[in-house]
Design a protein with these regions (language model features):
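Post-transcriptional modification and biogenesis factors for structured RNAs
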Residues: 1-141
Length: 141
């Protein structure tokens, strides 16, 4: 999905599956996205901060703001962070992030990682389209 929304990189903290396993589920789309691995959440945060990348985490925590009321700032690169279904976004990343959540009026309280990422990507692209040219989107995602 990252490639479909114009993202150029996928930052992964922890284990990165073999490329052949990723390709089996994503097809040729994986060829359009660089996968950048990080051993620890701290390594990722340090990298993002050194590069001036905004970290925006999707997580159900008290300080999170609803996605529908969040205004993305496209003055610097944006990194959308989602955690796995079991443990969520690591605290080391949450404490260094702007935190948002996806409002869900139904009976469930969480989505799987891919669904959550797609919703965050969609809202980010939607806001970007309203603010600038779609051709330049990959410069910021």
């Amino acid at each position: 999905s990252a490639a479909c929304f114009g993202a150029e990189r996928l930052y992964v903290v922890g284990h990165v599956p073999e490329r052949s396993r990723i390709k089996a589920s994503s097809g040729s789309l994986i060829d359009y996205v660089d996968i950048v691995p990080f051993a620890t959440p701290r390594d990722f945060v340090d990298f993002a901060k050194s590069e001036g990348i905004q970290i925006i985490a999707g997580e159900l925590v008290e300080e999170a703001r609803p996605l529908s009321h969040y205004d993305f700032n496209f003055n610097s690169h944006v990194c959308l962070v989602v955690g796995n279904e079991t443990s969520g976004v690591p605290p080391e990343i949450i404490h260094q992030s702007q935190v948002i959540y996806i409002e869900m009026p139904g009976v469930g309280y969480c989505l799987n990682t891919a669904q959550a990422a797609n919703l965050l990507l969609y809202e980010c692209v939607k806001q970007y389209n309203k603010s600038q040219s779609i051709d330049a989107l990959s410069d910021y995602l």
